[in-house]
Amino acid sequence: MNIRDLEYLVALSEFKHFRRAADSCNVSQPTLSGQIRKLEDELGIILLERTSRKVLFTQSGMLLVDQARTVLREVKLLKEMASNQGKEMTGPLHIGLIPTVGPYLLPYIVPTLKETFPDLEVFLYEAQTHQLLEQLETGRLDCAIVARVPETEAFIEVPIFDEKMLLAVSEQHPWASKSKIAMNTLKGQEMLMLDDGHCLRNQALDYCFTAGAKEDSHFQATSLETLRNMVAANAGITFMPELAVLNEGTRKGVKYIPCHSPEPARTIALVYRPGSPLRNRYERVANAISEQVKSILANKK
């Protein structure tokens, strides 16, 4: 048994899918499957139920996964302690980002991180919030950039910036000529939403509840770009994060309208494990990102 075997086991518990777990570990599916079997043989226990098409862990398997998470956390802590003895801003840094932030934030911050911290080797991963927090908990990620939600309170949260939500409507929509819109104007309206798993979905539902709007039950999107295209086709209206519209204008047939009373917004934060000896590293990275994003948002006004 080695650390890599435990990483395979935890990845399989996270993704509940052999191929996706193997991809996340950068190995082939047969390699991961073979190592899981070897682990079973070594321990003399059955970890998985192999009579189902789904990945189901036995009771023994679930107990081992919990213990593996603990071991991996301690190994990560040991590595961080060793890293902290050398140069603080040197070495690998594994950062996770949510899909409603990553594509729009990375073009701005990657050059900044390379310039500000040239000795950091940055690895980037995109996944939904619950997956990122699981990977952060087990030590597969060093930190994550997410929207603050109750689930992130178990970690140290470093606010990076507050991101406004704009109302996206088609250029053909009756509201397209408005320069701003009060939230109570949305009362009774149906809103296009992302599908389950996206934290932005829950936040948007909260905005709708406040405004008296409701979800359009006929459609759920897997990405902001799908929502944007549905709006451009005049198939509905939705909320869009500020970063996602910075360079859009009406290029795609969509008008973005600021909302008020109240102004919908979310806080984007960098989160990391409590007790990490690399706290100062994460704080410095968060500060560099914050300064860059705030400068960009200020210049766009």
Give names to the regions the model predicted.
Residues E40-F57:
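A short LG(V/I)-centered, amphipathic sequence patch enriched
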